[in-house]
Amino acid sequence: TNLITSGVLITEERLKKFYDAGLDHVQVSIQDTDPENSEKIAGYKGHAKKLHTCGLIRKVGLPLTVNAVMHRQNLHNLKSMIDLAVELDAERLEVAQVQYYGWALKNQTAFLPTKEQLDNATEIVEEARVRLKGILAIDYVVPDYYAKRPKSCMGGWGRQFLNITPAGKVLPCHAAESLNFLEFDNIKDKPLSWIWENSDAFNRFRGTSWMPEPCQSCDRKEIDWGGCRCQAFALTGNENATDPTCEFSPYRNVLDEPLSNVGKEEIPEFIYRKINVRKPMNGIGHNSNKSPKS
């Protein structure tokens, strides 16, 4: 079992309860080593709390992974991010370049790195892997816009992993709720084994029978499993489409514009995700019997 968290609401008491319940591992996302830029990216002042939480995780004896969410506006601090992971006594660092679906797709121009940035990051990671062997394991996820073949997202839909949201929904991957036509069963209502084996959501893209051409006749169909369903749906509107990051996808052209413009345009401001809170009209709450003045 693995907890993926921002770290801003975790207490030592809660971590101890997680440990006693059998939690195996914790991952904490860190947006940058520069506190000011970290909070600009996150849109929330939580950098110091994240670092404190990392210390608490190690204090209670849980293994720590630092999730370094990297992109165009923080890759210049990749070396210091690696150093920070060592300082925090992390067992593992995931240098994960932003994947462009969900809210990241809305900020694609602000996030997508240049090819030069990506090549430099790859060199830094390869050097650090050698230097820190036996000290820090480093996973490296590149933006698949630059790839010729898609990644095997989650090792294939419904094959190896599942994700449980704070509300109890059981998902085949972290971003699966972006597939808004699917319904996800809740662990509060049904046994986890039943959801894994029988739910419509987990069976929707499991295996290869759902695949169109060219995936269906591809010799890699049981290697990359058709790529990312969330990305295919976000970029094409067709959940069954071959992932556009594949060089053989009929939708590969949707990546041409962002890739041709990266580094040439001015970096836009971030579009932040905000929770809209209903405000009472003229100071009158929604439970009031009074009518607002016209």
Regions found by a protein language model. Give the residues of each.
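Radical SAM enzyme [4Fe-4S]-AdoMet core and its adjacent flexible, acidic
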Residues: 16-25, 29-171, 175-190
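C-terminal accessory region of radical SAM enzymes
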Residues: 114-146, 175-225, 235, 249, ...
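Acidic donor-binding/catalytic loop of UDP-sugar-dependent glycosyltransferases
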Residues: 12
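Short cysteine clusters
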Residues: 153, 168, 173, 215-218, ...
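Short cysteine/histidine-rich zinc-coordinating motifs and their immediately flanking basic loops
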Residues: 227-233, 239-240, 257-261
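Short Fe-S-cluster ligation motifs
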Residues: 200, 243-288, 293
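Short beta-strand->alpha-helix junction loop in the catalytic core
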Residues: 6-9, 32
